[in-house]
Amino acid sequence: MAIVFHKESRCFHLYNDEVSYIIRIMENEQLEQLYYGKKIHDREDFTYLHEECMRSQMSICVPEPGILSMQYTKQEFPTYGTGDYRSPALTIVQENGSRIVNFTYASHEIYNGKKDILPLPATYVENEDEAQTLEVTLHDAVMDTDLILSYTIYEEYPVLTRNAKICHKGSEKIVLDKIMSASVEFNDMDYEMVQLSGGWARERYVKNRKLEMGIQSIQSLNGTCSGAEQNPFLALKRPHTTENQGEVYGFSLVYSGNHLGQVEVSTFDMTRVMMGINPEDFSWELTQGESFQTPEVVMVYSDQGLNKMSQTYHRIYRKRLMHGTWRDQARPILLNNWEATYFDFDEEKILNIAKKAKEAGVELFVLDDGWFGARNDDYCGLGDWYVNLEKLPSGISGLSRKVEELGLKFGLWVELEMVNKDSDLYRAHPDWIISAPERFESHARHQFVLDFSKKEVVDYIYEMVAKVIRESSISYIKWDMNRYMTEPYSKGTEPSQQGKVMHKYILGVYDLYTRLTTEFPEILFESCASGGARFDPAMLYFAPQTWTSDDTDAAEREKIQYGTSFVYPIVSMGSHVSAVPNHQLHRTTPLSTRANVAYFGTFGYELDLNLLSAKEIEEVKAQVEFMKEHRDLIQVEGDFYRILSPFEGNDTAWMVVSRDKKQAVAGYYERLNKVNASWMRLRFKGLDEDQLYKVKWEDKCLKAYGNELMYAGIPVDRDYCNKTNGDFHSVLYTIEAED
């Protein structure tokens, strides 16, 4: 790992054992990107990679006879109005109305380690030898403003992180209309764009499209979250790249609010990728001495396919984004009462469910919505964070201790960012909701968005919920958020500051998370947003697991968890066994398949075990024991491999292999049964070719070498006409090395 500056050629080379990133200072003192990809040898002069020729209609930005044009240059941070007619990464409006800027090289610093960008979450280092950072300071003399571009390269990961910061020193105010976190350019357009798209109950479906000239993008304008529609991630892969071979570049934004990921192909087949805060309804005024910091983009390069890209994201996000008590721990097996009771419960019913959970070996009981205020339905009570003593006469403090006396840990659901109008909080502070003057106040789920851009609102909510936690014995918090923002306007905020509201809202969320996780470091936080609408890297910084989707149907979860695995580690995926018929789809799937899918996540239950048969209870007990035996491998110690995609056929398969390749667990899932089906073999991945393994599944056992299991494969059982399996059949394989 090194960051080298070659003074004569004015080139920067950032590299480790797997990746190189090269930029140079051009003759106009702006930055040009020369190369990003597989690691290449360092040399004194990389300027041979600069491409330049005279073209018709080009606007030249250097004195004659120079022919440098920004329109045909791969720029490091492109700006508006000086001959580049593609989308800029930065737009600044000055007091005279001009948007023309000229940020030129002023200085740079190379140092070991990595700085925080608080209050924004970001990846980190635990010692300075893990990474090196380059900070390049560019200066606009007319505005007297600095633009600082930061690059960090890690020793152990093919990862480059980037962010940008504006520091305004001039006497006249300026307004940021757009500032991306990173911009990267490629020589050609021979790529496919991979994105994770969807909606409620079908989050993060894998979508591919071939790049075309013009702009293709993903974005969120939801205000409160990164959204279920478009995850803040995209990748560019070569057309023939697969899970296991070929080039792919991943871009992941560590941010939970409005985002934009854009790929633009020029008429000369150059490809520009930009990612950052969505500029729509964003406007940030800076006066003298003020600054603005962008979120971080985590860029991953792989020349070994999509699965290597994913494993890199899994490792760095688990080890250098998540932090705190739970970073390196396997998760407790929980039971959540939501689908068992919804709002209809009392203390006796809750304790009966908890007792049965304890008998089955569950470790954590979670009380969901309905425990506070006058909360008996969606219409009222939200925002009143004090216990409903009619339902729970012992209070949360008493109930939590009764649950602990059963031998279980106790967890609690909250939705801190929202309010019902039928609540004491709203009646006391009607001006605390986000809404525009003299406009209809749109509602969703009968609730409204609290204005977290205001410190006094965050302060109030913090004190309310912290009081409940302090007085109780709580080991887990599920932090939900169930609606998007509408009519974005902050009452009492100056008109010139309204463009800051949505970003400041997200900063308010981060502030509350920081306060709670600081005061209660032992609590396991799980984020949630109508299921998986805020499954983004920034949330993992505060809450090391996220509710993956409200859709708990096993067959649907195959797609959701498969897509989620493109970026997010298995240990971050909230995954539960729920009742049948499923509450979202009314589909019935086998209890074994529901568990076989949920194992590849945090694992838990979302049902009333009292309603199961004695046979089913015994099956649940066996599932719990299996997960306890294998969760360190699945959640902490293993690498995840995708084998068969549910987006490409009727079958899904994946597996987790320990780093020493001594253990593995694999899941195979057949969606619909096939009559008189053809044979197929399941080929495992990630094993030691020369190691002898014992493979167990159902009542069968096989000893075979790793190369047999990976290349020849193992036949998937086919009974004649498949009469015995039925739809939604699954098989779980355990693989152990033989001495």
Task: Locate each region found by the language model.
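Conserved, mostly hydrophobic/aromatic
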Residues: E18, A164, G289, L335, ...
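C-terminal beta-sandwich/jelly-roll accessory domains of carbohydrate-active enzymes
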Residues: L672-D739
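Short Pro-Gly-centered flexible turn/kink motifs
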Residues: S98-Y105, W284-D303, F728-I735
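Polysaccharide-binding surfaces and accessory modules of carbohydrate-active proteins
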Residues: F5, S9-H13, D17, L31-E264, ...
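Glycine-rich, aromatic-flanked loop segments that form ligand/cofactor-binding clefts
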Residues: Q71-Y72, E76-I117, Q245-N258, V300-T325, ...
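Glycan-recognition surfaces
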Residues: N420-D459, H503-N610
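Carbohydrate-binding surface patches
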Residues: L234, P646-E689
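Aromatic-lined carbohydrate-binding/catalytic grooves of carbohydrate-active enzymes
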Residues: W326-Y460, Y476
